[in-house]
């Protein structure tokens, strides 16, 4: 019985045996020549670049560690190359070659043959006979109607109200379920020269339709990066009722020339410089950046600017002849993905 008790662990209890600690798997370090060396090595002994893809490592922590060390190695090599190049340039002195110009989207573009020459007779004739000729000949003064999509939310409504303080003689009206085809004849009957429609998606403004009345054209823009006045840091006080100055940058192609004239026709001819307010439409990389500033004269030689808001970014989607007609309208230009495969834009 005693022996049986001893075998059963005494008192009928089963003896508990500790399992031997599992042997740690041997790590494989990849040498710089691509060969694998077996054996337990520290993480610091692994050579870079590894002879395998880091994404093939299944263990998440190990994969993150290897990727972090690989990035550190890349930064060290880049810094060492910069220091070496700097020493070589200092040693050569005046004989050092000029620094290479960094590649950007703008300087890598192919020259666009449609760039407008302001002294061209054909361009002058087009300007004298297009839809904006009555404005530039001072026969009409701008009167703008600003509206929204159906059931707008607060952010879109506030953007319309702030736009009305930027553009003189502009009026904000709510859609109330009316279609644009019914709104446009009413605008023409009340002598409005332009119609601006702010569209939204998920309570955020995401589109702008600008239609010149009564004969068009109509431009559709994608809107992004909207910032209202309260969201702008170090903004100035609310704008005054003075007519702002307008600045149009880089609207040099035929398409850009037409869009620039559309924006110019929104503002009266004679800006009131005493108000020191300026509205800027800056075209760069096929995006149109809108900013509204006030000049701050610090002295006779120093001038600063103070942003008033709002600010947003536009990207042209289509340009349509005539007023808004989504079904039978004739389009002069439509954004296509294949058009941006080349750098000739």
UniProtKB/Swiss-Prot annotation:
Cellular component, GO, one term: nucleolus
Cellular compartment(s): Nucleus, Nucleolus
Major place of residence: nucleus
Gene Ontology molecular functions: RNA binding; rRNA primary transcript binding
Keyword rRNA processing: yes
Gene Ontology biological process terms, A to Z: maturation of 5.8S rRNA; maturation of LSU-rRNA
Sequence segments annotated as region (RNA-binding): 303-320
InterPro entries: Brix, IMP4/RPF1
UniProt-annotated stretches for the region Disordered: 1-57, 70-105
Keywords: Nucleus, Ribosome biogenesis, RNA-binding, rRNA processing, rRNA-binding
Ranges of compositional bias, category Basic and acidic residues: 87-97
Keyword Nucleus belongs to the record: yes
Domain Brix, chain residue ranges per copy: 142-325
Origin: domain of life: Eukaryota
Entry function: May be required for ribosome biogenesis.
Stored PANTHER family: RIBOSOME PRODUCTION FACTOR 1, U3 SMALL NUCLEOLAR RIBONUCLEOPROTEIN PROTEIN IMP4
Protein name, as recorded: Ribosome production factor 1
């Amino acid at each position: 019985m005693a022996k049986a008790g001893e075998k059963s662990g005494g008192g009928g209890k089963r003896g508990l045996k500790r399992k031997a600690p599992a042997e740690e798997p041997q790590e494989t370090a990849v040498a710089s020549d691509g060969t694998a060396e077996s054996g337990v090595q520290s993480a610091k002994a692994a050579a870079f670049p590894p002879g395998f893809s880091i994404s093939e490592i299944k263990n998440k922590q190990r994969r993150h560690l290897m990727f972090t060390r690989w990035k550190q190695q890349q930064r060290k090599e880049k810094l060492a190359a910069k220091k070496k190049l700097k020493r070589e340039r200092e040693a050569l002195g005046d004989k050092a070659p000029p620094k290479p110009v960094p590649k950007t989207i703008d300087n890598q573009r192919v020259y666009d043959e449609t760039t407008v020459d302001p002294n061209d007779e054909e361009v002058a004739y087009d300007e004298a006979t297009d839809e904006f000729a009555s404005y530039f000949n001072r026969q009409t003064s701008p009167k703008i109607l600003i509206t929204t999509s159906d059931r707008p939310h607060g952010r879109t409504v506030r953007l319309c109200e702030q736009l009305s303080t930027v553009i003189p003689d502009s009026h904000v009206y709510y859609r109330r379920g009316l279609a644009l085809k019914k709104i446009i004849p009413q605008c023409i009957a009340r002598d409005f020269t332009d119609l601006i429609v702010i569209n939204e998606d998920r309570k955020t403004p995401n589109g702008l339709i600008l239609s010149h009345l009564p004969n068009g054209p109509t431009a559709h823009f994608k809107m992004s990066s909207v910032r209202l006045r309260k969201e702008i840091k170090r903004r100035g006080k609310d704008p005054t009722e003075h007519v702002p100055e307008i600045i149009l940058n880089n609207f040099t192609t035929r398409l850009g020339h037409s869009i620039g004239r559309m924006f110019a026709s929104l503002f009266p001819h004679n800006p009131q410089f005493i108000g020191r307010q300026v509205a800027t439409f800056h075209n760069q990389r096929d995006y149109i950046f809108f900013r509204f500033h006030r000049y701050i004269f610090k002295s006779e030689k120093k001038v600063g600017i103070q942003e008033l808001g709002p600010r947003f970014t536009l990207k042209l989607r289509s340009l349509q002849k005539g007023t808004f007609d989504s079904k039978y309208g004739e389009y002069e230009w439509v954004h296509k993905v294949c058009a941006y495969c080349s750098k000739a834009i």
